């Protein structure tokens, strides 16, 4: 597929600077783009690459347009504009409606005639798969699950039981949704299992990364509201609620019954203690541990920035002495009084 700069600009409300008849047939980074490819500039650190890029068209801000040596498309937010343009060239394989001969479907399950059910899929009792859904190879849909219209489970996704997916949900390989929450009680020196009687509800337009686990609730449902984006290898425990339009980066763990607000961003390897609340529009930077509820929007951090090993060892040794040093300072202050 080939598109002119003018056609792209018209479709996405951009402004052409240069030759609007320039054609592109793909996308690439500034450093690796070649003839006939479109790229973008959103981070100022890559601005020097404009002088050398071979990209036919570059999406950028108005104040960077003069530095572009070829055709430019001016956007208020170049990265978002690029994401929309790149989708035009993302030619995903077409999945024809139908049920593969190797699939095993319970007689009480309902599968839309327009859905695609791939090889070695299992669909349990009373579950429903909606119009235009794609159920990838080896995926398992347990009992009493709902997969609403336009949703896609890639290979080896497991919906254990009582999982309800909204419309246009996309779940990547290896994810497990609706497994038992980690509910235990100590009885006479031995653990006993607390039954997990709730489910999982995932709203419209959510995306769940590979090998992520979202446990079902103990009594109430674990809930992801609409347009939540979850990266790979994330653990969301039972009874959590993730607010709409929030994004959670890889290797983050959220303990049970935590409540995350709307439009929140959690960086990689964040830990969230259970039974707390984070308000809307909070950013948690990578490696942070959230031990208390957050009631004010803003950016929060608790991780230690990288430094050379020698400096880190000195700082770590001094950190261990903080309490002793603080007591000495207080003692000196009292002596002077």
From Swiss-Prot:
UniProt cross-references to PANTHER family, sorted A to Z: UDP-3-O-ACYLGLUCOSAMINE N-ACYLTRANSFERASE (PTHR43378), UDP-3-O-ACYLGLUCOSAMINE N-ACYLTRANSFERASE 1, MITOCHONDRIAL-RELATED (PTHR43378:SF2)
GO terms under biological process: lipid A biosynthetic process
Functional description taken from the UniProt entry: Catalyzes the N-acylation of UDP-3-O-acylglucosamine using 3-hydroxyacyl-ACP as the acyl donor. Is involved in the biosynthesis of lipid A, a phosphorylated glycolipid that anchors the lipopolysaccharide to the outer membrane of the cell.
Active site: 238 (proton acceptor)
UniProt entry keywords in alphabetical sequence: Acyltransferase, Lipid A biosynthesis, Lipid biosynthesis, Lipid metabolism, Repeat, Transferase
Pfam families reported in the protein's UniProt record: Hexapep, Hexapep_2, LpxD
Lineage, uppermost ranks: Bacteria, Pseudomonadati, Pseudomonadota, Gammaproteobacteria, Lysobacterales
GO CC terms in record: membrane
Protein name according to UniProt: UDP-3-O-acylglucosamine N-acyltransferase
Record-listed E.C. numbers: 2.3.1.191
Catalytic reactions of this protein: a UDP-3-O-[(3R)-3-hydroxyacyl]-alpha-D-glucosamine + a (3R)-hydroxyacyl-[ACP] = a UDP-2-N,3-O-bis[(3R)-3-hydroxyacyl]-alpha-D-glucosamine + holo-[ACP] + H(+)
UniProt subunit comment: Homotrimer.
Metabolic or biological pathway, per its Swiss-Prot or TrEMBL entry: Bacterial outer membrane biogenesis; LPS lipid A biosynthesis
Species name: Xanthomonas axonopodis pv. citri (strain 306)
EC class: transferase
Family: Belongs to the transferase hexapeptide repeat family. LpxD subfamily.
GO molecular function, one term: N-acyltransferase activity
């Amino acid at each position: 597929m080939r598109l002119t700069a003018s056609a792209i600009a018209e479709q996405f409300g951009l402004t052409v600077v240069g030759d609007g008849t320039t054609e592109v047939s793909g996308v690439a980074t500034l450093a690796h783009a070649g003839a006939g490819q479109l790229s973008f500039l959103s981070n100022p650190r890559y601005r020097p690459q404009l002088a050398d890029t071979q990209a036919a068209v570059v999406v950028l801000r108005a104040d960077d347009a003069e530095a572009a040596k070829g055709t430019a498309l001016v956007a208020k937010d170049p990265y978002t504009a690029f994401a929309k343009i790149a989708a035009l060239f993302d030619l995903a394989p077409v999945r024809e409606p139908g049920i593969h001969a190797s699939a095993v479907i319970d007689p009480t399950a309902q599968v839309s005639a327009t859905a695609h059910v791939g090889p070695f899929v299992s669909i349990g009792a009373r579950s429903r798969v909606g119009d235009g859904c794609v159920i990838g190879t080896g995926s398992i849909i347990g009992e009493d699950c709902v997969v609403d219209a336009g949703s896609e489970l890639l290979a080896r996704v497991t919906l254990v039981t009582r999982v309800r997916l909204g419309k246009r949900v996309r779940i990547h390989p290896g994810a497990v949704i609706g497994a038992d929450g980690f509910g235990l009680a100590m009885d006479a020196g031995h653990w006993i299992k607390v039954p997990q009687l709730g489910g999982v509800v995932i709203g419209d337009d959510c995306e769940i990364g590979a090998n992520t686990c979202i446990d079902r609730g103990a009594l109430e449902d674990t809930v992801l509201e609409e347009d939540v984006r979850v990266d790979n290898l994330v653990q969301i425990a039972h009874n959590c609620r993730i607010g709409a339009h929030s994004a959670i980066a890889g290797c983050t763990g959220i303990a049970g019954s935590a409540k995350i607000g709307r439009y929140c961003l959690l960086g990689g390897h964040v830990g969230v203690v259970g039974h707390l609340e984070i308000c809307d529009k909070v950013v948690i930077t990578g490696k942070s541990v959230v031990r208390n509820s957050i009631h004010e929007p803003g950016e929060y951090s608790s991780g230690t920035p990288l430094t050379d090993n020698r400096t880190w060892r000195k700082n770590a040794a001094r950190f261990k002495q903080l309490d002793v040093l603080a007591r000495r300072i207080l003692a000196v202050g009292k002596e002077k009084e």
